[in-house]
Amino acid sequence: MFFINIISLIIPILLAVAFLTLVERKVLGYMQLRKGPNIVGPYGLLQPIADAVKLFTKEPLRPLTSSMSMFILAPILALSLALTMWIPLPMPYPLINMNLGVLFMLAMSSLAVYSILWSGWASNSKYALIGALRAVAQTISYEVTLAIILLSVLLMNGSFTLSTLIITQEHMWLIFPAWPLAMMWFISTLAETNRAPFDLTEGESELVSGFNVEYAAGPFALFFLAEYANIIMMNILTTILFFGAFHNPFMPELYSINFTMKTLLLTICFLWIRASYPRFRYDQLMHLLWKNFLPLTLALCMWHVALPIITASIPPQT
């Protein structure tokens, strides 16, 4: 039975990811005054299926000088971790209701760094290695602010369980009392998922394609799926943390609809940002974090710790 539960979680995620690629190409197309994919199926709706068939039927080439085991393990690990991070997400009921769901998600996102590092190193290519090193530095750096922002939100929530955030936000979304944190969180999620304007790991102009330059066919598709699964997952987390969807226990499907709409809007924001902004320079990316975001998040975290103590109140759900 539990196996069926897992399958019923994984298949919709993979479908959502497949159609997100289509949405991205359509949105970018219309923003650049062109049509986007419109040949395969009505209005190009079957394009993701055609892409999947093409990628998985091609021969998976491997450079002769690459380290075979790591080269193959890296994309599998990337997708496995991307899917594992969905387990504690309340939609409105999680697959496993963990006591420390937030901590689990942070740990999993930290592990994702290894798949990037292995793929870059195992490819035995200069471009792949530079891309991997950039990705690792960027991901590890932005995880610092993500963790501090999460801590501040959890102080208002009063528990490490994500499900209790639904109850905390019954009267007011947390974006109102913590809007500077929400802004920094959104930008940090962009950097964490390697999206434009922080897509330095894939800098086409300088690094060909970044850490996955030597990958083709199936393994490349796995990296691609992992990246987009992470994008949707990060937007879901943003929705749960700051835009608590309305939840009526007698009609949980209303919650799911509300929650999906908010996640979709945030995902389209990601695509809009990609269409609008040029890529950051690497030093600007690091300065933004270590000199701007980190001091600000630390100050706001201290503020959120001090406020309940000063007003002698306790957070809900303790």
From Swiss-Prot:
Q: How does it sit in the membrane?
A: Multi-pass membrane protein
Q: Which InterPro entries does the record associate with it?
A: NADH_UbQ_OxRdtase_su1/FPO, NADH_UbQ_OxRdtase_su1_CS
Membrane spanning residue stretches? 2-22, 70-90, 100-120, 147-167, 171-191, 223-243, 253-273, 294-314
User: One biological process GO term for this chain?
Assistant: mitochondrial electron transport, NADH to ubiquinone
Gene Ontology CC annotations of this record: mitochondrial inner membrane; respiratory chain complex I
Cellular compartment(s): Mitochondrion inner membrane
Reaction(s) the record says it catalyses: a ubiquinone + NADH + 5 H(+)(in) = a ubiquinol + NAD(+) + 4 H(+)(out)
Q: Which Pfam families does the UniProt entry name for this protein?
A: NADHdh
Q: What class of enzyme is it?
A: translocase
Q: Which cysteines are joined by disulfide bonds?
A: none
Keywords carried by this UniProt record: Electron transport, Membrane, Mitochondrion, Mitochondrion inner membrane, NAD, Respiratory chain, Translocase, Transmembrane, Transmembrane helix, Transport, Ubiquinone
Q: What is its EC number?
A: 7.1.1.2
Molecular function via GO: NADH dehydrogenase (ubiquinone) activity
Q: What is this protein's function?
A: Core subunit of the mitochondrial membrane respiratory chain NADH dehydrogenase (Complex I) which catalyzes electron transfer from NADH through the respiratory chain, using ubiquinone as an electron acceptor. Essential for the catalytic activity and assembly of complex I.
Q: Which family does it belong to?
A: Belongs to the complex I subunit 1 family.
Q: How does it assemble?
A: Core subunit of respiratory chain NADH dehydrogenase (Complex I) which is composed of 45 different subunits.
Name under which the protein is recorded: NADH-ubiquinone oxidoreductase chain 1
Q: What would be the name of the gene that encodes this protein?
A: MT-ND1
